[in-house]
Amino acid sequence: MTSVQPVPRLVEQFERGLDAPICLTWELTYACNLACVHCLSSSGKRDPRELSTQQCKDIIDELERMQVFYVNIGGGEPTVRSDFWELVDYATAHHVGVKFSTNGVRITPEVAAKLAASDYVDVQISLDGANAEVNDAVRGKGSFDMAVRALENLSNAGFTDAKISVVVTRQNVDQLDEFAALAARYGATLRITRLRPSGRGADVWDDLHPTAEQQRQLYDWLVAKGDRVLTGDSFFHLSGLGAPGALAGLNLCGAGRVVCLIDPVGDVYACPFAIHDKFLAGNILSDGGFQNVWQHSELFRELREPQSAGACASCGHFDACRGGCMAAKFFTGLPLDGPDPECVEGWGAPALEKERVKPKPSGDHSRGTKQGPVALKLLTKPPARFCNESPV
């Protein structure tokens, strides 16, 4: 009699890696009309090596063959590419759904009407404050009004279930109820994500990331009111604050297993928050296409191997938090097999106080001079926008 092999649990299948990513982030351009102080890709200027329209279409063809359901398109500000809408139409016509993140600069009433007529496009508007004072201190003067105008245009056009994407910071964690109300006003869904010390975020992380008390506040809010709030894998490092399973979301680092990132020049990174040579798996143009990189790169094979708990092996919360975020540890100069810098047991804080060597960024696409670290209190004057002309 042939024995039936048990089907691995879903998380076990994820840990071993899938034939195609569940969540593929594609940064179409580094060009951006804003200069957000925490931008994970240090965007601003367009890279002259940026993939052409045809090269992008070739990648979409490959994603269709791999049966990738959808891509998260970002940047930079993806809508400043002159071929952006052409690429969106091409993707949806080839069975690849599109979710794109935007600051709202190009979401006019006409564009909103076009988006409302599509069944395969999702729109995510970035906001980091529930009012202009908080938001514009991080994203630039006028960015709050621009984002709200985009939400109004989408709502008026009948676009259903847009997303409002919020990076939780020390300054906006008290506004979670206000963000939820803003989403309800425009028939949108609230999505909140963790601040990572990546890109320009490395310069401001010490001043912007929530305190330990605010982490508890965030956790309690998510447990009490977060049923309809999207978080992805942002806050699995907080799982140890309560009962197992109390916090919704994926308690797993999916880097190279179920997620990855394609950058504007075709480089493939293990994680959207880890744009650094250490996490570079290959290049679509020079390494035989995306499928070859995803399925055969040495880095991805290593990430799919069973991982040691390292310094967290004796912690009773390890099965819940899995040691936290790889990118957060790497960009704060902490060992990858050690505690998360925001470890709820408090092990991250003393690790951060020790001498550390923070990795230098692999690339910086900022326009002009980098803004310095922000003050602990709100800035009295929003940072000036670096770029008032077309960044393309």
Curated annotation (Swiss-Prot):
<feature type="binding site">
    <location>
        <position position="312"/>
    </location>
    <ligand>
        <name>[4Fe-4S] cluster 3</name>
    </ligand>
</feature>
<feature type="binding site">
    <location>
        <position position="271"/>
    </location>
    <ligand>
        <name>[4Fe-4S] cluster 2</name>
    </ligand>
</feature>
<comment type="function">
    <text>Radical S-adenosylmethionine (SAM) enzyme responsible for the first step of the biosynthesis of the enzyme cofactor mycofactocin (MFT). Catalyzes two reactions at the C-terminus of the mycofactocin precursor (the MftA peptide). The first one is the oxidative decarboxylation of the C-terminal L-tyrosine of MftA, forming an unsaturated tyramine moiety. The second reaction is the cross-linking of the tyramine with the penultimate L-valine residue, forming a five-membered lactam ring. Its activity requires the presence of the MftB chaperone.</text>
</comment>
<keyword id="KW-0004">4Fe-4S</keyword>
<feature type="binding site">
    <location>
        <position position="253"/>
    </location>
    <ligand>
        <name>[4Fe-4S] cluster 2</name>
    </ligand>
</feature>
<feature type="binding site">
    <location>
        <position position="32"/>
    </location>
    <ligand>
        <name>[4Fe-4S] cluster 1</name>
    </ligand>
</feature>
<feature type="compositionally biased region" description="Basic and acidic residues">
    <location>
        <begin position="354"/>
        <end position="367"/>
    </location>
</feature>
<keyword id="KW-0560">Oxidoreductase</keyword>
<comment type="similarity">
    <text>Belongs to the radical SAM superfamily. MftC family.</text>
</comment>
<keyword id="KW-0411">Iron-sulfur</keyword>
<dbReference type="InterPro" id="IPR023913">
    <property type="entry name" value="MftC"/>
</dbReference>
<feature type="region of interest" description="Disordered">
    <location>
        <begin position="354"/>
        <end position="377"/>
    </location>
</feature>
<dbReference type="InterPro" id="IPR006638">
    <property type="entry name" value="Elp3/MiaA/NifB-like_rSAM"/>
</dbReference>
<feature type="binding site">
    <location>
        <position position="315"/>
    </location>
    <ligand>
        <name>[4Fe-4S] cluster 3</name>
    </ligand>
</feature>
<dbReference type="InterPro" id="IPR013785">
    <property type="entry name" value="Aldolase_TIM"/>
</dbReference>
<keyword id="KW-0408">Iron</keyword>
<dbReference type="GO" id="GO:0051539">
    <property type="term" value="F:4 iron, 4 sulfur cluster binding"/>
</dbReference>
<keyword id="KW-0479">Metal-binding</keyword>
<feature type="domain" description="Radical SAM core">
    <location>
        <begin position="18"/>
        <end position="228"/>
    </location>
</feature>
<feature type="binding site">
    <location>
        <position position="325"/>
    </location>
    <ligand>
        <name>[4Fe-4S] cluster 2</name>
    </ligand>
</feature>
<protein>
    <recommendedName>
        <fullName>Mycofactocin maturase MftC</fullName>
        <ecNumber>4.1.99.26</ecNumber>
        <ecNumber>1.3.98.7</ecNumber>
    </recommendedName>
</protein>
<feature type="binding site">
    <location>
        <position position="36"/>
    </location>
    <ligand>
        <name>[4Fe-4S] cluster 1</name>
    </ligand>
</feature>
<feature type="binding site">
    <location>
        <position position="260"/>
    </location>
    <ligand>
        <name>[4Fe-4S] cluster 2</name>
    </ligand>
</feature>
<feature type="binding site">
    <location>
        <position position="39"/>
    </location>
    <ligand>
        <name>[4Fe-4S] cluster 1</name>
    </ligand>
</feature>
<keyword id="KW-0949">S-adenosyl-L-methionine</keyword>
<keyword id="KW-0456">Lyase</keyword>
<dbReference type="Pfam" id="PF04055">
    <property type="entry name" value="Radical_SAM"/>
</dbReference>
<feature type="binding site">
    <location>
        <position position="321"/>
    </location>
    <ligand>
        <name>[4Fe-4S] cluster 3</name>
    </ligand>
</feature>
<dbReference type="InterPro" id="IPR007197">
    <property type="entry name" value="rSAM"/>
</dbReference>
<dbReference type="InterPro" id="IPR023885">
    <property type="entry name" value="4Fe4S-binding_SPASM_dom"/>
</dbReference>
<dbReference type="Pfam" id="PF13186">
    <property type="entry name" value="SPASM"/>
</dbReference>
<feature type="binding site">
    <location>
        <position position="343"/>
    </location>
    <ligand>
        <name>[4Fe-4S] cluster 3</name>
    </ligand>
</feature>
<dbReference type="InterPro" id="IPR050377">
    <property type="entry name" value="Radical_SAM_PqqE_MftC-like"/>
</dbReference>
<dbReference type="GO" id="GO:0016491">
    <property type="term" value="F:oxidoreductase activity"/>
</dbReference>
<dbReference type="GO" id="GO:0016829">
    <property type="term" value="F:lyase activity"/>
</dbReference>
<dbReference type="GO" id="GO:0046872">
    <property type="term" value="F:metal ion binding"/>
</dbReference>
<dbReference type="InterPro" id="IPR017200">
    <property type="entry name" value="PqqE-like"/>
</dbReference>
